[in-house]
Regions:
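Bacterial signal peptide processing site
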Residues: 20-22
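Active-site substrate-binding loop(s) of clan PA
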Residues: 92-93, 159-162, 174-205
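Active-site region of chymotrypsin-like
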Residues: 98-115, 155, 171-182, 207-292
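N-terminal activation segment of mature serine protease catalytic domains
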Residues: 26-124, 289
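Bacterial N-terminal signal peptides
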Residues: 8-17
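Short, surface-exposed secondary-structure boundary micro-motifs
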Residues: 134-136, 200, 257
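Bacterial N-terminal signal peptides that target proteins for export
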Residues: 1-7
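Catalytic-histidine neighborhood of serine endopeptidases
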Residues: 120, 126-128, 132-168, 175, ...
């Protein structure tokens, strides 16, 4: 099973994680997330989002108020639970749900420039000051901090770990109040139910994919059995922590890992890829973690 951890990669000659020149800040803010209308959807500029995150996180990391990653990981490993009173949220469209999806990423310095960078994964708001992602997104001691970028372009540093479970691969993180409408947590989705997912695979920010619940099964984490959910909607590296949504826009799962099935293996080399399983955390485990 391959956990979706973010590493510097290149596609078609474009370096996806590294130094980039910073565009004019005003131009970035004006172009990164244009206002949508009934006739025109929001247009995502991946390159400008990366550059804006680099610029903003460099400013934030230079302040004295950043909670260091080692402190977040220390709290993470305590595996706190919380009895949370979540706000009542009405049914959400895909466009509304998109605004509650966040980029969640560890902050690091490369060896080619003085700037700070973000290794982006995914997450979503369940309250205006609470974001959910995977445990393994936070558990990276090589990072210096943890940043969150909202759909509207604002960025925050994570202040605290409110709840976490390594076995369930979940973390609930505290932010300053954002004023953003969160997504609702729904009931468990039956096998065959239609689902969608909004995530950031390989820095293709706010990509929507659709599919169905394929099955529920038992997997192993830390040598302990734990229920999991598989879906047919595509996701990949950078999608960890993304919300799996039902047709009412409610969260029914959280993207966690992929597992590739190859037909042959010779001398340790796998060949003839047949299919890829997309494994998720069921929403029931998140509800258990936060006392829902």
């Amino acid at each position: 099973m391959n956990w979706i951890k973010l590493l510097p990669v290149a596609i078609a000659g474009v370096v996806l994680c590294g130094c980039t020149s910073i565009l004019n800040e005003e131009a970035i803010l004006n172009e990164e997330a244009p206002a949508s209308s009934h006739s025109e959807p929001s247009v995502i500029n991946d390159r400008q989002i990366v550059q804006q995150m680099t610029s903003r996180v460099t400013e934030m990391m230079d302040s004295d108020s950043v909670v260091e990653m080692k402190d977040l990981i220390e709290k993470l490993k305590e595996e706190p639970k919380a009895k949370l009173q979540l706000p009542e949220v009405s049914q959400s469209s895909a466009d509304e749900a998109q605004k509650a999806v966040a980029v969640v990423g560890g902050v690091y310095k490369c060896n080619r420039c003085p700037d700070w960078h973000i290794a982006p994964a995914s997450g979503f708001l369940i309250a205006e000051d609470l974001v959910v992602t995977n445990y393994h997104v936070v558990d990276n001691p090589e990072r210096s901090g943890l940043a969150v970028r909202l759909f509207d372009g604002r960025m925050f540093m994570v202040e605290d770990v409110v709840a976490s479970s390594e076995q369930y691969d979940l973390a609930v993180l505290r932010l300053p109040k954002t004023g953003v409408k969160p997504v609702a947590l729904g009931p468990s989705a039956p096998v065959g139910a239609k689902v969608s997912l909004i995530s950031h695979p390989n820095r293709k920010f706010y990509t929507l994919s659709e599919g169905r619940v394929a099955r529920y099964f038992v997997t192993q984490r830390n040598r302990k059995p734990v229920p999991a959910m598989a879906i047919t909607a595509d996701f990949g590296k950078g999608s960890s922590g993304a919300p799996v949504l039902n047709e009412q826009g409610q969260v029914v799962g959280i993207a966690a890992s992929t597992e590739s099935l190859y037909y042959t293996e010779k001398e340790g080399v796998q060949n003839n890829l047949q299919m890829v399983f997309k494994n998720c955390v069921p929403v029931s485990q998140l509800l258990e973690l936060i006392g829902g």
